[in-house]
Amino acid sequence: MKRITILGSSGSIGKQTLNIISKMKENVCIEGLAVGSNIKILKSQIKKFKPASVSVNSPAEAQNLKKWCISNNIKTDVYKGNTGLEKLTTMPKTDMILAAIIGAVGLKSIIAAIKAKKDIAIANKEAIVMAGSYIMKLAAENGVSVLPVDSEHSAIFQCCTDEKKSQIKRIILTASGGPFYKYDKDFSKITVEQALDHPTWKMGRKITVDSATLMNKGLEAIEASVLFGVSIDKVEIIIHPQSVVHSMVEYVDGSVIAQLSNPDMKLPIQYALTYPERLPSNIKPLNLIEINKLEFYNPDFNKFPCLSLAYYAAQKGYTVPAVMNAANEMAVASFLNKEIKFTDIAKIVGRTIKTHKISKSTSLDTFIEADYWARHYAEKLINEI
């Protein structure tokens, strides 16, 4: 029986993970759950999964939740804030942490989990982009496995588990293209509602906007470089609208290994939870005759400048990816609040990167300071628009 703690259980990945676990009760159980402020969802999860501990952001909400647990005769410990997250990640009985808190805020809890020698199922690509070299070094020192949850990185992982990284010629990262890869109108007129209308995946608001700008694919390119120990120039992005080929790995002998399935996040989530085993699932079987065709296109870096910014940040390295990620988080939040235009996202990220003075220190504090600086600088740019 594998005991799992989910950080971000009220989000899209968290809820899908719980749905999977509810059908795998003989193999996996829930030890802990953490949410930001969605107490209503957390209460329903507590009733169903009976975790030993939970954590919420607000001290007041934590106190109210404690009272609710007592009144309902529920024996679940309730914690709060960053301290609560750290308690959840270090619980002795937990075997694996599923890190699904979006953005850089999830970084410290991942670090705490690794130091407590907990395996990590990583759904927080921003943490890897921000401080990936630090995370992977720490994981190696503590004998911790970092298992990807993103469909693309799960695919890469499945394509190269038994191969030496030195034999990889390139990683081919597929992208659906989002809602705008064929869009030929004025990008500055794109609305929030249009950006949130993804043709393939149902995801959270922030990642859906990132998919629309293709920044999500840029972040994933950096994540692939870090997770699989290859230089960014060996990571190639191609547009694949059907989202059936989730990624490919080409080796030095010319062989290309791909992972295919119908687009369903439950598959990579389940694989991360059960690795190295594979268990039956209710994923719709792949029927290539029914699909009929698989299309592939080169991405347009001019049309989607966030892709160029991501590759630039990866090539510069050090603190630049952290700065890019933080500026993007700020810009996307402002776009979702209808404060800036769709095209302003890339402009804000680009100006923040170009103003940043690179630090070559690899300490965790350096990455956190770069993130802090970038958020404040991006906010300044947003206020000037």
Curated annotation (Swiss-Prot):
Pathway membership: Isoprenoid biosynthesis; isopentenyl diphosphate biosynthesis via DXP pathway; isopentenyl diphosphate from 1-deoxy-D-xylulose 5-phosphate: step 1/6
Keywords: Isoprene biosynthesis, Manganese, Metal-binding, NADP, Oxidoreductase
Positions contributing to Mn(2+) binding: D150, E152, E220
GO biological-process terms attached to the record: isopentenyl diphosphate biosynthetic process, methylerythritol 4-phosphate pathway involved in terpenoid biosynthetic process
Binding site for NADPH: S10, G11, S12, I13, G36, N38, N124, E126, G204
Obligatory cofactor(s): Mg(2+); Mn(2+)
InterPro entries, A to Z: DXP_reductoisomerase (IPR003821), DXP_reductoisomerase_C (IPR013644), DXP_reductoisomerase_N (IPR013512), DXPR_C (IPR026877), DXPR_C_sf (IPR036169), NAD(P)-bd_dom_sf (IPR036291)
Reactions the enzyme catalyzes: 2-C-methyl-D-erythritol 4-phosphate + NADP(+) = 1-deoxy-D-xylulose 5-phosphate + NADPH + H(+)
Domain of life according to the entry: Bacteria
EC number(s) reported in the record: 1.1.1.267
Binding sites annotated in the UniProt record for 1-deoxy-D-xylulose 5-phosphate: K125, S151, E152, S176, H198, S211, N216, K217, E220
Family that this chain belongs to: Belongs to the DXR family.
NCBIfam families given in the database record: Dxr, PRK12464.1
Cross-referenced PANTHER family: 1-DEOXY-D-XYLULOSE 5-PHOSPHATE REDUCTOISOMERASE, 1-DEOXY-D-XYLULOSE 5-PHOSPHATE REDUCTOISOMERASE, CHLOROPLASTIC
Function: Catalyzes the NADPH-dependent rearrangement and reduction of 1-deoxy-D-xylulose-5-phosphate (DXP) to 2-C-methyl-D-erythritol 4-phosphate (MEP).
Protein name: 1-deoxy-D-xylulose 5-phosphate reductoisomerase
Organism expressing this protein natively: Endomicrobium trichonymphae
Name of encoding gene: dxr
